[in-house]
């Protein structure tokens, strides 16, 4: 069973720290959802935690304001590092005090954030290195 918690940005870091101090050893997933034209606020951060010792899971959901900025939790869970970078790269969400908030999947000079629902597709020709030739 998973406990779902909807929390505010202001409570986010403190709640994650509380989970860490109460036996939730693992942050197992961190992603974002773009609710474009369906919900306000548009973006939501979803983070899953696991306590092996207690055999419990917790899912935290945080609705993001228009600033799209939230504290990084890499100081509490180093495993959040690449997840936060991926969410930054794909959605444009800023993680304050992240040790290396740079693109992780897209080229450094890429413009835009491809998993946003308003991101145009098919506009930019992409050259794939070592792509097999197809007849």
Question: What residues fall within each predicted segment?
Answer:
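Terminal low-complexity/charged segments
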Residues: 1-135
